[in-house]
From Swiss-Prot:
The keyword Cell membrane applies. It is found in: Cell inner membrane. This is UPF0056 inner membrane protein YhgN. Keywords: Cell inner membrane, Cell membrane, Membrane, Transmembrane, Transmembrane helix. The lineage of its organism: Bacteria, Pseudomonadati, Pseudomonadota, Gammaproteobacteria, Enterobacterales. It comes from Escherichia coli (strain K12). One of its GO terms (cellular component) is plasma membrane. Belongs to the UPF0056 (MarC) family. The gene is yhgN.
Length: 197
């Protein structure tokens, strides 16, 4: 039980639902509330499916594509960096996701890389490699972490009402700065792994 809880805490910290709130709100701010909820449920379910696939078959997928784990880290860092720059310096039209106003996101950037990002996918591969006989526990931990993320992100409209548009914009820029640092670290970790390999 302790292993499940510790793994779930680790996974939810990596998923970072509170950090992702401003990005989700920004990407979906031109969408009607009912449609926004449906999109979020769809994107979160896609993210869960991707995470489960990587938990069970991540190493095999990378081997099949002749990709190394550091490739996931480097490419993920680049994508997150570009998203972060758009958060800090939003264009006059559209939003920080790079989508035109009113256009619906599909898979990128919400499901991947924000919820099911390179860090969580690499962590799931690592956990499945370290604990091959405890896959049931790992699945439960993943479902708990995903469930917590699901609940927090579905309450984004509540945060929007509490913070207001200016508050969300300020939070978005702050998270953009943090995301730049996280993306840079992810990129550097990938480079470090590549140089060691």
């Amino acid at each position: 039980m302790n292993e499940i809880i510790s793994a779930a805490v680790l996974l939810i910290l990596i998923m970072d639902p509170l950090g992702n709130l401003p990005i989700f709100m920004s990407v979906l701010k031109h969408t009607e509330p009912k449609r926004r909820r449906a999109i979020m449920v769809r994107e979160l379910l896609i993210a869960l499916l991707v995470m489960l696939v990587f938990l069970f078959a991540g190493e095999k997928i990378l081997a099949f594509l002749s990709l190394r784990a550091e490739t996931v880290s480097i490419s993920g860092g680049i994508i997150l960096f570009l998203i972060a720059i758009k958060m800090i310096f939003p264009s006059a039209s559209g939003n920080s996701s790079g989508l035109p106003a009113g256009e619906e996101p599909f898979i990128v950037p919400l499901a991947i890389p924000l919820v099911a990002g390179p860090t969580i996918l690499a962590t799931l591969m690592l956990l499945s490699h370290q604990y091959p006989n405890q896959m049931g526990h790992l699945v439960i931990a993943l479902l708990l972490a995903w469930g917590g993320t699901f609940v927090i992100l579905l309450q984004s409209s509540l945060f929007l009402r509490l913070l207001g548009e200016k508050g969300v914009n300020a939070l978005e820029r702050l998270m953009g700065l943090i995301l730049v640092m996280m993306a840079t670290q992810m990129f550097l970790d990938g480079i470090r792994m590549w140089m060691k390999g």
